[in-house]
Amino acid sequence: MSDSLSFWKTSCRMLARGVAVTLVTAGLILTQAAYACTSFVLPSTDGGFVYGRTMEFGFKIDSKMIMIPRSFEMTSQLSAATAGKKWQAKYATIGMNAFDLPALVDGMNEKGLAGGILFFPGFAQYTDPSTVKPENSLTPWDFLSWALGNFSTVAEVKAALETVSVVGVVQADMGFTPGVHYTLHDATGASIVIEPTDGKLKVFDNPLSVLTNAPSFDWHMTNLRNYVNLRPMNVEPLKINDATIQPLGEGSGMLGIPGDATPPSRFVRVSASILSARKVPSGIQSVRLAEHILNGFDIPIGLVQNAANDQQEGMDYTQWSTIADMKNNVYYVKTYEEQILRGVTFKDLDLNAKEFLTIRIPTTVDALPVLQQK
């Protein structure tokens, strides 16, 4: 994209097609903290794509990297007494779980379909489990594992959505029903957002490939209209009579871009970041570019708090960030404690294993020395 071209032209074309504005009922009450997540896809110069996301929570979700092999039999457990949808994974998947469950909150399959679960508190409206058959029902936290395990493209996922319902049930480790929505991207660059609304799964094509949290995706797209003046180019000096007013330093074209950690602000900022970033070849160059962008959305402990106190519990922070190279099938992760990016490739794993595999993420608390010991 040319430097002189405002990065908002993409979003404006989308809005011109008629993106509807969804107004949320005023009586809607948020019962959980609005945990932050930010996701995006970067195109490369050679037709590849890299997906990146952060995972924020106010309490430890005990995530581990796992590999779910081909033919692994999975069941979405609706309650202790009720089994939901059962399926056998068609494709192997690598990703991050939570609470030691064999379920993915983020991941990529061997065909390059990648995506994640992002928090959507106060807006998710799931299907009532009493109104649908259990054998067609998925919990909110099992939907991504089902999608990545069974499909290779976002078109296939869209076609299969009518066969399942995502039902509102309590997640035992959390103690409440987590409100979430989903982002999915395939190796061709196609992207969709799936949101549970009015008991149904609403699908949006995602021309920008970005997603954060509440409110709904179409609201975020409409909100971009407030920022159509932003561009990566510095503004020209302003001449007033005999005076020339120069911008104060670099970045004047982005003056006014929101810098806080709220979902609407992060949506605007990550859109600006990916659409103005210069494309590079796929592989490690694109991965490093994605890492630089992710660093701009890293939330340290203490920046986001529900109340003024010295207790870490409830302070939203970036527990981990992931990058999926969808062309080369490499999945990377770095954690709050371990900032070195670690990668796993499908070719290094037994994709036909009988059990799902937990992959240990090395921990290096100290910085690595510049001069290596002989």
What are these regions (language model features)?
Residues 36-135, 168, 373-374:
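A contiguous strand-loop segment
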Residues 30-36:
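Sec/Tat signal peptide C-region and signal peptidase I cleavage site
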Residues 128-164:
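Compact, glycine/acidic-enriched structural inserts
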Residues 154, 158-196:
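Aromatic- and glycine-enriched pocket-lining scaffold segments that form the walls
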Residues 13-25:
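Sec-dependent N-terminal signal peptides
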Residues 110-111, 148-156, 283-287, 326-328:
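A short, structured loop/turn motif at beta-sheet edges
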